[in-house]
């Protein structure tokens, strides 16, 4: 199927799809708010939300929160740039919805007498479009902090921009191997390419070749980076309450605050949907249900897609309840010093492997011998290479001066107290001389 075949629908059908998708996302957000609260309560041995409807498990509490934010007064801080301050939530809201236009929710179905796909549209660079929209969403965060005329808001927006840009690089690199294996950046074609059976040693396993299984390092890197992109625990540094009150949304209230609240949960669902599409087989039935063709086509794809995506959302909630917040320097070191180098090395390795397979070099014994020698040399160098003495260049510990900053600070257990200096030393010397001279 060509990626552009999904754009031949009548205009009225495209509008219907957009409206239905918009309603689904709003309802799904309400469900995910309730779902997160209930899961956190169960993991923390609490009751959780039961307000308004004990029989419904408290699901209407999320509805009440949304209505409350809609009707609350919208305040603008004194000194804020009013135009940019009000525009920032709109940018964040539009960006979180736009990515869903290229995410396939299912295969071909019959809708109002027309055969169509459960996807608004598809383009040859659909995944690149999703990454571009995510970059636009950063402006909604940066402009919110810059226009609020508040210290906490500005610091939160700067943290968020640095965090999202840093982890977007690693996320993009983790997806390159998916493009290499599928041969396309179209979301629908990537899903279809995962329907091929996994072949091991010439034996057909009849297991769908999902990329989470074939490209495990890429899958792990994407899962880590999606937490950084969504500003969720353990990477919620832009709005951590213990340091920045509420970060870049500190000065917002009412409907604009609700827009950021909505954008956070839709972004979480978007990243989960992208994970489902690129690594978990999309709307295809999981193994071994894929043996039954009846439940692996048509409207059944909608069920499998939402079940897989909800499973990833549950992982979001589980990590929030189980893992504490990272320190900022550790978080940035993880992105720049670990994830990006590992992603680059993995991309080179996968590209080289695909080249060897496509060119048929794997059958050449000379090539295999050369590769074996190189691998052995690398292993020997890694384990037998000279190691630098990490303690050789360390500077000796200097005596601790408790009055260096102007205030007395008690030394830590491993620090050495410096001798008294200045007036105190002079006074001590004068008293000693006075005692030695017999008081003269």
UniProtKB/Swiss-Prot annotation:
The chemistry this enzyme catalyses reads:
a quinone + NADH + 5 H(+)(in) = a quinol + NAD(+) + 4 H(+)(out)
Q: Can you say what this protein is called? A: NADH-quinone oxidoreductase subunit H
**Gene Ontology biological process terms in this record:** aerobic respiration
Which InterPro entries does the UniProt entry name for this protein? NADH_UbQ_OxRdtase_su1/FPO, NADH_UbQ_OxRdtase_su1_CS
Subunit-level organization = NDH-1 is composed of 14 different subunits. Subunits NuoA, H, J, K, L, M, N constitute the membrane sector of the complex.
On whether Iron is a keyword of this UniProt record, the answer is no
Q: What is its main location?
A: membrane
The similarity annotation says:
Belongs to the complex I subunit 1 family.
> Which molecular-function annotation in GO is an example for this chain?
NADH dehydrogenase activity
Keywords in alphabetical order, please. Cell membrane, Membrane, NAD, Quinone, Translocase, Transmembrane, Transmembrane helix, Ubiquinone
Compartment(s) of residence: Cell membrane
Q: Where are the transmembrane segments?
A: 11-31, 83-103, 123-143, 164-184, 207-227, 261-281, 299-319, 331-351, 366-386
| PANTHER family found in the cross-reference section | NADH DEHYDROGENASE SUBUNIT 1 (PTHR11432), NADH-UBIQUINONE OXIDOREDUCTASE CHAIN 1 (PTHR11432:SF3)
- State the function annotated in the UniProt record: NDH-1 shuttles electrons from NADH, via FMN and iron-sulfur (Fe-S) centers, to quinones in the respiratory chain. The immediate electron acceptor for the enzyme in this species is believed to be ubiquinone. Couples the redox reaction to proton translocation (for every two electrons transferred, four hydrogen ions are translocated across the cytoplasmic membrane), and thus conserves the redox energy in a proton gradient. This subunit may bind ubiquinone.
Enzyme Commission number(s) from the entry: 7.1.1.-
- Could you tell me the membrane topology recorded for this protein? Multi-pass membrane protein
């Amino acid at each position: 199927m060509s990626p552009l075949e999904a754009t031949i629908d009548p205009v009225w059908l495209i509008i219907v799809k957009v409206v239905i998708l918009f309603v689904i996302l709003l309802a799904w957000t309400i469900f995910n708010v309730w779902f997160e609260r209930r899961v956190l309560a169960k993991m923390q041995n609490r009751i959780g939300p039961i307000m308004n409807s004990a029989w419904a498990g408290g699901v209407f509490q999320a509805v009440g929160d949304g209505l409350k934010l809609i009707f609350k007064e919208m305040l603008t801080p004194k000194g804020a740039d009013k135009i940019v301050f009000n525009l920032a939530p709109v940018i964040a809201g539009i960006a979180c919805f736009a990515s869903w236009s290229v995410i396939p929710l299912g295969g071909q179905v019959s809708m109002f007498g027309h055969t169509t796909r459960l996807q608004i549209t598809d383009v040859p660079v659909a995944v690149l479009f999703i990454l571009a929209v995510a970059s636009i969403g950063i402006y909604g965060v940066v402009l919110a902090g810059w226009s609020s005329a508040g210290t906490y808001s500005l610091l939160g927006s700067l943290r968020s921009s640095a965090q999202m840009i840093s982890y977007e690089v690693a996320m993009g690199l983790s997806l390159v191997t998916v493009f290499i294996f599928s041969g396309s950046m179209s979301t629908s074609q990537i899903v279809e390419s995962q329907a091929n059976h996994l072949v091991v040693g010439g034996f057909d396993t009849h297991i769908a070749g999902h990329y989470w299984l074939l490209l495990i390092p890429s899958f792990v890197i994407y899962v880590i980076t999606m937490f950084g992109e969504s500003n969720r625990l353990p990477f919620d540094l832009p709005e951590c309450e213990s340091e920045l009150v509420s970060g870049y949304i500190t000065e917002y209230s009412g409907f604009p605050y609700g827009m950021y609240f909505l954008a956070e949960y839709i972004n979480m669902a978007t990243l989960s949907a992208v994970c489902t599409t690129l690594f978990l087989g999309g709307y295809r039935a999981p193994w071994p249900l894929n043996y039954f063709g009846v439940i692996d086509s048509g409207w059944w794809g909608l069920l499998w897609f939402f079940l897989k995506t909800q499973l990833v959302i549950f992982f979001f909630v589980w990590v929030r309840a189980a893992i504490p917040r990272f320190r900022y320097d550790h978080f940035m070191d993880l992105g720049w010093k670990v994830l990006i180098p590992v992603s680059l090395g993995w991309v080179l390795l996968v590209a080289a492997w695909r080249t060897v397979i496509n060119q048929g070099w794997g059958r050449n014994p000379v090539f295999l011998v050369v590769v074996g020698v190189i691998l052995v040399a690398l292993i020997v160098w890694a384990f037998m290479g000279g190691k630098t003495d990490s303690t050789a260049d360390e500077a000796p510990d200097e005596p601790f001066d408790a009055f260096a900053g102007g205030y007395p600070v008690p030394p830590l257990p491993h620090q050495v107290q410096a001798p008294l200096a200045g007036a105190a030393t002079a006074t001590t010397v004068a008293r000693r001389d006075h005692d030695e001279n017999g008081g003269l």
